[in-house]
A protein has these predicted regions:
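Non-cytosolic beta-sheet module surface loops
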Residues: 33, 55-57, 110
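Short beta-strand His + acidic residue motifs that chelate non-heme Fe in jelly-roll/DSBH
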Residues: 53, 74-76, 98-100, 106-111, ...
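Glycine- and acidic-residue-biased ligand/ion/polar-headgroup-sensing regions
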Residues: 60-79
Length: 157
């Protein structure tokens, strides 16, 4: 890993292109090695990407999101899957980021053509225990994803 890494317009521009071309309509750019205890990365989202509501409980980890470009709708869910809170996060403010304790059900939706977020959480990353998905909501690839995205977006109009 490089000693320093600069977050500049060239890096963001290349990641935006990559996210728009990706099947999942998003991409991550890691600044860390997978085994590091502090995971930090850019999460670049394009419109209509879907992030199934989830939490980090089995391997409890706090998370921090800061929007560097664009806007996202950040959703917090109750245990039964009802939406408890919604926060519009924007690079222009007034809300620019959010910090979550482990075990909080959450999701986010991209409200602009593209959104670039800096995300930090505890590591190391282990995909087998990283996330628990909420059973009330569809997983990626499900036929109800488009409808769910539209519903999430409607909460921020």
């Amino acid at each position: 890993m490089q000693e320093i890494q600069i977050i500049d317009s060239d890096l963001i521009g290349s990641l935006v292109t990559k996210a728009k071309q990706a099947e999942r309509k998003r991409t991550n750019h890691n600044f860390h090695e997978q085994k590091e205890v502090y995971q930090r990365f850019l999460n670049v989202l394009s419109k209509n990407t879907y992030i199934s509501p989830h939490r980090h409980l089995s391997d409890p980890k706090p998370e921090t999101f800061v929007v560097l470009e664009g806007e996202i709708g950040f959703l917090i869910f109750s245990e039964d899957g009802n939406i408890k809170e919604s926060h519009k996060l924007s690079s222009n403010g007034p809300k620019r980021g959010i910090d979550l304790q482990p075990g909080v059900w959450h999701s986010l939706v991209c409200l602009t053509d593209v959104a670039v977020c800096f995300e930090g959480k505890s590591g190391p990353y282990d995909p087998t225990v990283d996330k628990e998905f909420h059973p009330k909501y569809p997983l990626e690839g499900d036929s109800k994803v488009k409808e769910t995205i539209q519903y999430f977006e409607s909460l921020f109009i």
